[in-house]
Design a protein with these regions (language model features):
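Phosphate-moiety recognition in structured ligand-binding domains
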Residues: 6-18, 25-34, 108-201
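Active-site phosphate/pyrophosphate-binding segments
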Residues: 1-108, 118, 184-201
Length: 201
């Protein structure tokens, strides 16, 4: 039984989406999400290759705006849990209030930047990081040629309605952490100092 429970994150998110859709008088299309997730899972080999370029780093920054910020938190948590890399997530809009001081060639950033309502602002944050010699890996929308010219590496996910991006972005974040941990020869199913259930406060 794996301690780093990726299914719990996706399951909770799916449950919340179904409640939100129901309260809005809409029906959530499970099959649509399943089909998109299958497409994202086909990126596994690509993500493994990208992970091979980052697994030796000891520190990582994750950034995102709006719903992408909680995803950044999940991505950073998974990376630190199973690969033992120090990873911190920040709202992209807060970069200039402190976190940008951490940017360097030795501390890459994973930027969540799909083509959504905050795309241009997040892209501007990425440009600020690149201007300070930071290395950036982005998760972006298929066909986004603009971001390809700015970042060092990119994982593309299918273009969907804005509210569905979290499902497509969570998978690459989790796969990236998995492959980094695997390359570092960490025990992915049983990370050190962690237990499946927390029994003490």
């Amino acid at each position: 039984i794996g301690v780093a429970s990726t299914k719990a994150f996706l399951g909770q998110m799916l449950g919340m989406y179904k409640i939100a859709y129901s309260l809005n008088g809409k029906e959530f299309d499970n099959q649509k999400i399943v089909d998109y997730i299958k497409r994202v899972l086909e990126l596994d080999t690509l993500i493994q290759g990208i992970a091979s370029q980052y697994y030796l780093y000891q520190n990582f920054i994750y950034i995102g705006r709006n719903t992408n910020y909680p995803l950044a938190l999940e991505g950073a948590l998974k990376l630190k849990e199973i690969s033992y890399i120090h990873a911190e997530a920040y709202p992209a809009g807060e970069l200039k209030h402190g976190p940008i001081a951490l940017v360097s060639e030795d501390m890459p950033t994973l930027a969540i930047c799909p083509q959504d309502s905050v795309y241009n602002k997040t892209l501007s944050n990425i440009e600020e990081i690149k201007a300070r010699n930071g290395k950036v890996l982005a998760i972006a929308t298929e066909g986004d040629e603009k971001i390809s010219k700015i970042v060092d590496d990119v994982i593309f996910v299918p273009k969907v309605e804005e509210e569905l991006y979290p499902f497509l972005i969570a998978i690459p974040l989790q796969l990236f952490a998995y492959h980094v941990a695997d390359l570092r020869e960490c025990d992915i199913d049983k990370p050190r100092n962690l237990a499946k259930s927390v029994t003490v406060e």
